[in-house]
Amino acid sequence: MANMTLVKTPMPEQDPKVRARNFKEVALGYTPEQAIEEANRCLKCKNPKCVEGCPVNVRIPEFIAKVQEGDFKAAYEIITSTNALPALSGRVCPQETQCEARCVRGIKGEPVAIGRLERFVADWYRENINAMPEKVESNGHKVAVVGSGPAGMTAASDLAKMGYQVTMFEALHTAGGVLVYGIPEFRLPKAIVANEITKLEAQGVEVMTNMVIGRVLTIDELFESGYEAVFVGSGAGLPMFMNIPGESLVGVMSANEYLTRTNLMKAYNDDADTPVIKSKAGAVVGGGNVAMDAARCGMRLGAEHVYVVYRRGEAEMPARLEEQHHAKEEGIEFKTLCNPIEIIGDENGRVCGMKCIRMELGEPDASGRRRPIEVPGSEFMLDVDTVIMSLGTNPNPLIRSTTPGLETNRKGCLIVNENEMTTREGVFAGGDAVTGAATVILAMGAGKKGAAAIDAFIKSK
């Protein structure tokens, strides 16, 4: 029976007062009954637009129809025919600007909760079946994948399904890329990422950690050792700073480092020996999802006050509305239309405050957003002992600098053609290494496209 309710079926969540001090997952997921209730909101459009908004082309109406029937296994099989990582995308994909943005139900009310349903199906399968994929017979061709984040994992999975012998190289000691070092446990439990890595290994993908391509091995050496193509999905891990006075003080760090220490190296665990600054009052500079993650981690690590300092207004914040909402519920204070101009230190070289100036919005800039302009004489002090810079990241130049013929743009992003091939024949790339910091699902889409292009390239030789 169709469910004509104008709003989504609510997702159970941890109480904000409780979750603000723990790292357990915030969103608890649908029950089977709730999933079926939400699936029944789908109108079964003859010409569904939702699929057009999905970077990995999930057959959304088909999987939702199976959820309506209670056939969750079939729903999972439909999703994974094009999306290798539904438990991940169902949690961190910005559906509100993609598939759900095109849902007809959104015209008069809220769209169908496609992301929540995808997550439910993936979780149900993992908890009730969790069958490992079968290894496909080898076609005798070797491909290297550099980086084990969403782009690399997707490319490796698709290539393995085609019969390629795939080796995935990860620079850190744990595979998963940004999924393990960047996204906190309370948004994406690491056990889920580990399960996806296990599935890749079941497909025959060899996962090699502590392998920094460009230092331990170069791209040229990969080709010399028999790999016929290389996919570079090494992400964008080089943080940007403001270059204001005081950035070298103790207590200032990038969100990239802060989240890596907290998430990958488990600084939140009292048994871990990972050093991380546990502040009483912290400021996170920036307004994206990474800024929200850093601010929410700061609160969980014991801070009494955490501020998000952003130079534009709240309406211009790039962070997902859901992440902003969760941050506010947990006690994070937003300081919008403000910009730091100096970080103040004490006699020991430690942060003791941040001098800011108020901003106003002028005419739109090249990004289409109104340009922030300083308001003269509006300086004020923010009493903080920690400052986390979350201003975006660029790709690390290591691979480019050690690979002849590999060209990048002015931001250090690899230049690729319409088939994801770089300026070096046989080297393909996708994800943040090409686009700069973007979304998990766009990286997954690039991984799919890169795998298909590598297959065509090798077959054409």
Task: Go through each PLM region and give its residues.
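N-terminal Rossmann-like FAD-binding beta1-loop-alpha1 element of flavoenzymes
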Residues: 141-167, 291-299
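Feature captures the FAD/FMN-dependent oxidoreductase FAD-binding
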Residues: 74, 137, 142-146, 194-244, ...
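Glycine-rich dinucleotide-binding loop and its adjacent helix/turn
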Residues: 121-137, 195-215, 239-301, 408-419, ...
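Rossmann-like dinucleotide-binding cores of NAD(P)H-dependent redox enzymes
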Residues: 168, 172-203, 207, 295-342
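Local cysteine-cluster metal-coordination motifs and their immediate loop/turn environment
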Residues: 40-62, 86-107
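Ferredoxin-type iron-sulfur electron-transfer modules in oxidoreductases and energy-metabolism complexes
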Residues: 19-37, 59-91, 108-137, 262-263
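A conserved FAD-binding loop/helix module that cradles the flavin
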Residues: 433-460
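FAD-site-proximal beta/loop scaffold in flavoenzymes
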Residues: 248-279, 364-437
